[in-house]
Amino acid sequence: MSSHENQRRTFVIFNPASGRGAGAKRIDLYLDLLRKRLPEFEHAITSRPREESELAAQAVADGFELIVAVGGDGTWSNVADRLVSLGNPSVALGLLPSGTGNDFGRNFGISPRSPADAVDILARGVVTETDVGRVVSAGAPLGDAADQTTDESPVTGRHFLNLVGFGFDVAVIEDTAGAHFLRGELLYKVTALKNLFSFKGVAFELMSDEPGVDGDHLMLTISNAPFFGGGFPVDSPRPTLKVCLQSPQQRP
């Protein structure tokens, strides 16, 4: 798509629960900025977990061509998962940050510190192709997009934008969910520092051509982007997914 102002029929989805409630405080700000930059758009505000996926699917069915998700990495991933599952290449995803980490948006110069700049990037109408990953699991569902291969061998799948992690980063996310005194990037940094010294590691068994990957590791990440956890760098040469292992002895 050329770099002229966005002319796509646009639907904006706000997640007020993103960023531990910070998303609710940014709704009026974003609406004001969007009305100044977009010729017209419609919007909805979620009222329960994962409703953004349903709203995105309905918006596509109603003929909208640009689905804008206002939230953080979780909100963006939920909407992206549904859009990819629908398989309509003419529909684009827009990102406006109001979450805790907002890591995937950093790939495109989208900063949570400047809502006006984020809306400006959206309004320019430039579409950039990006990779997505997909996790499949036999048995337990992995979210809204579930593919059933056979009745005897169900396999569920879920697409992701930023990364899939096991171990240390999961412990950090669990701690952020229980914290009540911080928000945003600082929350991630404080809980990460705490777990850096207390987390013991997890035993992994991996199917890989690389020798010596089994054993205890601090974390395993399968990344599609260079940042996670509120701006922490992770080794991820694009355009391929990168598997990163870190042992407990490799703590910074």
Task: Locate each region found by the language model.
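Internal helical hairpin/lid segments
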Residues: 218-252
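Short, solvent-exposed amphipathic alpha-helical segments in soluble enzyme
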Residues: 27-30, 60, 84-85, 177-180, ...
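Short N-terminal binding/cap micro-motifs at the start of the first secondary-structure element
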Residues: 19-23, 130, 229
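Short, conserved loop/helix-junction motifs that constitute active-site signature segments
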Residues: 3-5, 9, 86-89, 238-240
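Short amphipathic alpha-helical segments
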Residues: 24-26, 80-83, 106-108, 233-234
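ATP/NTP phosphate-donor binding region
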Residues: 1-70, 77, 81
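Short glycine-rich anion-binding loops that position phosphate/pyrophosphate groups of nucleotides
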Residues: 17-19, 72-75, 98-101, 166-168, ...
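Catalytic core of DAGKc-family lipid kinases
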Residues: 36-37, 46, 85-218
